[in-house]
Structure formats: structure tokens, C-alpha cells
Amino acid sequence: MANEKKVAREPSFLLALVPIVAMIGFMLYCFLGHSESGYHDAHMPLVMSIVVACIVGHFCGHDFKDMLSGMIERLSASMEAVLILCTVGFLVASFMASGAIPSLIVYGLDLLTPKLFLPVGCILCAIVGMACGSSWTTTATIGLAFLGIGAGLGINPALTAGMIISGAYVGDKFSPLSDTTNLAAAVAETGLFDHVTAMVSSTGPTLVIALILYTIMGLNIDASAYDPTVAQSIQDAFRGAFVISPVLLIPIIVVIVMCILRVPGLVGIAISVATATIFMMIFQSTDIYGSRALGDIFNTLHYGIGVETGNEVADSILGKAKGMDGTMWTINLILLALLSLIHISEPTRQAEIS
């Protein structure tokens, strides 16, 4: 009888809430209670909630070895999303180094006219958001440029800001490079491109309605107040650092084609990275990525590029392409979030309590 395995019991409602309360408490401590401490990330509160959840599970009769096995089993189901996020870092770096994103921005800014500033600006923010996979990056970079252009046209800053945020978030949600898009697909245990396609039915009509309204409002803008120097300075900065060509948009087209064909995420991104890397070696100066030596190419994909143009907006965009190294913060957060919210609570049945 001594070798019989102890039967675990179901935790009470209050006991099941302990890990959640602990996580909230540690987050409040880090973000509000002791802001002078210098730690403002969510990682350690999640780690502490995992520790508390393990203690609660052990108190209810679960063996630590069984809990660990349960975590590993459930974590393996999410590894594809984590691997995709790693390769997304390669994709962002290769797109930037190849000149794909700079070319996209340069040609997009050519489309700006006073009457179409609002709808075209929204579309450009969506495109840039898709290309770089970050609504915040889009808002903080080209979005700031559009605020300056909008001010020159005499447009209400709140309206311009709404246009920027609308486009940036639409682009972020449709982007296979976005960390939140990958996280949503991982939590839902669905394919990345399936998740992106599923959002078209809800986000697509919303974008169309917004563009119609922006077009109507744009027709009332005074075209004589338009100052093209802000957009021109960004274009000149990119042209000075990169070779700009329509051909360099091909890597971005490859991603779109992979999404339409519903190619598995890892395969589609790998093909796009290979395409962009080849274009980088053919078209761009070695000043951008060091040399054609394999080590420098690996360095670019891992850590990104360090190009400076002298233009604040352009440099901010370029600075976001940090390669795989730039995705590690998000990957760590995703793993800890999955462990604390799913992989601990499910094996110990804490998630079943209501």
C-alpha cells in the first residue's frame, strides 16, 4: 500500500484564485508600488505566479514530477508559434537589410496628396504595420511624420492620430510578423496564417468603412497648406542609405503569396527570409550588413543592422529591426504567460474551478 500513488484533490475556489491574485499583486508591485526599483516587465510576476501555482498544486496532492510532465506536454503544442516568432526576427532584419521596407515606405510616401492624405495615410500605416509587425513602431515612427504633415495641412491632430492608430493596428493584426498575432494563434492552438485569414471578415469591413469616412473628410482639406518637406526628408534619408527599387518589394509579395496559399508559417517565413537575404546580397551595399561572408549575414539576421541616416524618423524605423535578438523578450514573455495561465493551471485542475 505504501507504493500507491496519492490521489490529488480538486482545489477550492479560493485556493484556485491564489496564483492569479499573486500574479496581479506582483504586477502591481512592479508597475505601481515601487516604480523606482527600475523593474517594469511582466516576466518576474509571471515567474512568481508559476511558483505559487506549483505550491498550490502540491498542496492539493499533485507531485512536482507530474506537474512538470504536464507542463512539458502542453508546452510542446505551442512550440511552433515560438519557433515562428524566432524566424520573424530573421524576417524583419532581412526585410530591412534588403531594402524591402525602405522601398515600401519611399514609394508609399509618393502617393501622398493633400486631398487623399487621410485615406492614403491610413493605408500606408497599415502597410508599414504589416511590414514591420508592430503597431507601436508604426505609430512612433512614420506616424509621427504624418502628425507633422497633418499639422501643416491644418487637420485636427486628434483626427490625424485616429487615422494613424487605425491603420497601424489593422496592419499589426494582419501581420505574420506581429508578436501579438503569433501569441493569439499560439493560445488558440491554430495555424498562424489561418488566424490572420480569420480576422479578415471582421477587421476588413471596419477598415473599408474607415477609409470611406477618411476620404469624405479629406475632400474638405485646404490643399494650399500642404508642406511636402517632412515626407521628402524621410524619403531622402532612405534613398541615401539603401538602393530603392520596385524589385525589392518582391520579398514582401512572397509573404503575401505564402499567406494566400496558406503555406505553413515556418515554411513561408523561411522562404521569405531566404528571398530577402538573396536580394540583400545582390542589391545593397556591404555597409549595411558588413560583408558577404556567412558570419556577417548570420550576424545581420541575429542582431539586425546598425545603419544611421541622420533622420530621426527613418532611424527609429531602422532601429526596430533587431533580428532574432529583438524577439527574445517577447518569446520569454509568451512562454511564461503560457506556463502560468495554461500549463500550470490545467495539470493541477486550477483552471476548472469557477
Q: PLM features: residue spans?
A:
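Hydrophobic transmembrane alpha-helices that form the pore/transport pathway of multi-pass ion
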Residues: 111-201, 354
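Short juxtamembrane and helix-loop transition motifs at transmembrane-helix boundaries
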Residues: 4-9, 96-106, 124-127, 224-238
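Residue-level detector of conserved catalytic or cofactor/ligand-binding positions
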Residues: 342-353
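Hydrophobic transmembrane alpha-helices of multi-pass solute/ion transporters
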Residues: 3-87, 97-116, 254-336
